[in-house]
Amino acid sequence: MKVRASVKTICRNCKVIRRNGVVRVICKDPRHKQRQG
């Protein structure tokens, strides 16, 4: 899980979602998981 100021999709399987006011990237590649913070 990377914590970044700006989250971007890395591959085409990445999806930007908003969960409890936190912007996240979910992907089937676990290295692409990101959270805004």
Swiss-Prot record:
Cellular component terms (Gene Ontology): cytoplasm; ribonucleoprotein complex; ribosome
Sequence intervals crossing the membrane: none
UniProt superkingdom: Bacteria
GO MF annotations in UniProt: structural constituent of ribosome
Pfam family membership, one: Ribosomal_L36
A biological-process GO annotation: translation
InterPro entries (alphabetical): Ribosomal_bL36, Ribosomal_bL36_sp
Keywords, alphabetical: Ribonucleoprotein, Ribosomal protein
Record-linked PANTHER family: 50S RIBOSOMAL PROTEIN L36, CHLOROPLASTIC, LARGE RIBOSOMAL SUBUNIT PROTEIN BL36C
Family designation: Belongs to the bacterial ribosomal protein bL36 family.
Matching NCBIfam families: rpmJ_bact
Name the record gives this protein: Large ribosomal subunit protein bL36
Species of the source: Thioalkalivibrio sulfidiphilus (strain HL-EbGR7)
Upper classification of the organism: Bacteria, Pseudomonadati, Pseudomonadota, Gammaproteobacteria, Chromatiales
